[in-house]
């Protein structure tokens, strides 16, 4: 397990605010939901605000796990992934919070730090509940952003950045083997999955076997739910939690978008998707969304009810794939 989860205080973050803005920090509030980094709203003495990201062991709730395919699907954390993904997405014209400060010195706080623009319009998830009519054009703009990202392609899968590695075998084989590992882990914990483990393993192998390797891959966010989209003062969508971005079969993204946006997915849909890839990635995705939350709950993450709900929902989705 990573560190002891000692969150930072206003006093701890004064030097960060001073370095970023040249002003005194009035208060620092840790925002909820982060599992791999600390997210803090920094309120300055003039009333303006910024957002601080802190990466260190104490802010990371995830138990360490071996992953032989780190180039493509591994848990995404760290300032270098953030910087590379932020740059890559911004170059497509898609809005991400502006960067105010990057500090890797560990002099300001015990960890790597980024300070970014505070987009105060709230999340798209909340907007769809609070004002569905206002959310509709934001969703359409988000669809355009998704398509702009997908249009940025390259010949090898993996994370962005000059030093990023790529898998040495077809992406669908990487996804299959990862899903089989997730299935094995989940079957040890969930009797309903254990009872049909062989059928699920067979379905993964069969769905993967019909896929032909691809020569180009599109840019995806990786975890693009409405909670990872903020809305700015002009009702433009702003993508956050971008560290998982990379080049991959775009069907992986759309399997996730279908799940997270539900009846509003049509705003984000694109033509020409490979239906066989979608079918394969849906099953792999549901297994990952059981394994991940259950593994996170091996530690001290405080949002336990929410993670259990995600796992339970995706257990049902996984079993439904056998119908």
Task: Give the ranges of each region predicted by the language model.
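ATP/Mg2+ or Mg2+-diphosphate-binding catalytic cores
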Residues: 185-189, 195, 289-323
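Charged, low-complexity intrinsically disordered tails and linkers
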Residues: 2-45, 152
């Amino acid at each position: 397990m990573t560190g002891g989860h000692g969150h930072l205080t206003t006093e701890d973050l004064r030097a960060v605010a001073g370095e970023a803005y040249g002003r005194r920090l009035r208060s620092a509030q840790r925002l909820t939901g982060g599992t791999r980094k600390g997210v803090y709203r920094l309120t300055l003495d003039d009333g303006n605000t910024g957002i601080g990201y802190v990466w260190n062991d104490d802010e990371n709730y995830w138990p360490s796990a071996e992953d032989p395919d780190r180039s493509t699907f591994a848990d995404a954390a760290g300032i270098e992934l953030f910087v590379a993904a932020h740059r890559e997405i911004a170059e497509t014209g898609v809005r991400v919070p502006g960067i105010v400060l990057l500090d890797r010195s560990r002099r300001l706080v015990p960890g790597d730090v980024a300070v970014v623009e505070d987009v105060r319009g709230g999340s798209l998830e909340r907007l769809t509940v609070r004002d569905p009519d206002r959310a509709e054009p934001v969703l359409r703009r988000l669809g355009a952003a998704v398509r702009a990202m997908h249009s940025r392609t390259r010949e090898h899968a993996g994370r962005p950045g000059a030093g990023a590695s790529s898998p040495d075998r077809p992406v669908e084989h990487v996804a299959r083997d990862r899903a089989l590992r997730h299935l094995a882990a989940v079957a040890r914990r969930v009797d309903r999955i254990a009872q049909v483990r062989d059928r699920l393993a067979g379905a993964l192998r069969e769905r993967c076997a019909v896929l032909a390797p691809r020569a180009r891959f599109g840019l995806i966010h990786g975890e693009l739910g409405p909670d990872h989209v903020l809305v700015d003062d002009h009702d433009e969508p702003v993508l956050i939690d971008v560290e998982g971005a990379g080049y991959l079969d775009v069907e992986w993204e759309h399997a996730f978008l279908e799940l997270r946006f539900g009846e509003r997915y049509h705003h984000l849909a694109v033509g020409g998707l490979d239906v066989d890839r979608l079918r394969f990635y849906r099953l792999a995705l549901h297994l990952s969304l059981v394994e991940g939350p259950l593994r996170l709950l091996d530690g001290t993450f405080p949002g336990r009810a929410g993670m259990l709900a995600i796992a339970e929902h995706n257990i049902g989705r996984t079993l439904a794939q056998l119908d």
